[in-house]
Amino acid sequence: METKIKLYGTERCHKTQYYKSFFENKNLSYVFLDVEEDEINAIELRNLYENKKLNFPTITISGKKLRNPSEKDLNKWINKLL
């Protein structure tokens, strides 16, 4: 079964670290995809955007793409899609 929550980012990005903590504090299963350490993750992230840029942090929840969402928006989509 495919992971429902994916977090694209880097270890050195403070916003990425915020989302990692957010998911862990809510006991949500997610996969972290480091776009600096793994070129496949970078390509996957680029393919989510028309401009093909590394727009991180990006979160996908059951296929819904969220670019640097607010906590309110993130909670809304988690409740709606999970």
Locations of the language-model features?
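Local sequence-structure signature of Cys/Sec-based thiol-disulfide redox active-site neighborhoods
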Residues: 1-29
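Glycine-/small-residue-rich active-site loops that bind phosphorylated ligands and cofactors
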Residues: 14, 37, 66
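Short alpha-helical
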Residues: 14, 40, 73
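Alpha-helical elements of the RecA-like P-loop NTPase motor core of helicases
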Residues: 17, 21, 43, 75-76
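Thioredoxin-like thiol-disulfide oxidoreductase module
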Residues: 35-54
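Non-catalytic, surface beta->alpha helical segment in thiol-disulfide oxidoreductase systems
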Residues: 61-82
